[in-house]
Amino acid sequence: LDALIAIGGDGSLSILHELARRGNWNLVAIPKTIDNDVACTHWSIGFDTAVNTIVDALTRLTFTAASHDRVMVVEVMGRTAGHLALHAGIAGGADCILIPEIPYSIEAVCRQINDLHDRWGRRFAIVVVAEG
């Protein structure tokens, strides 16, 4: 065995880290996680696909929310990292994005949604929430 290549997220890369700590291995780590939460990387494999899939869903939900005067809350994956919710929410035109890195209160979220109605006459909203 000349080298070990690990393609994965936190779990796979933590195993690789442990191998590096224990011995003299030639190791290559390739981040692959939709969470996009691997340190020292800008993008990970899978993140862009996940963002675009969520944006497609948000586009469809926006039409449904508008036609039925609803507030739609969409929970996206990401564990304790809000990268996926933030990027997809911005690209998908969400009215409110809630991520674990920024504390929020339900009261503030309700005020923001009510402001859409009071200021712009909007009778619907899209809220994206990271699962963490």
Protein language model regions, located:
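Short glycine-aspartate micro-motif
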Residues: 4, 27-29
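Accessory alpha-helical/coil subdomains and C-terminal extensions
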Residues: 6-8, 16-18, 23, 47-132
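Gly-rich Lys/Arg/Thr-decorated short loops/hinges at beta-loop-alpha junctions or inter-strand turns
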Residues: 32-42, 67-69
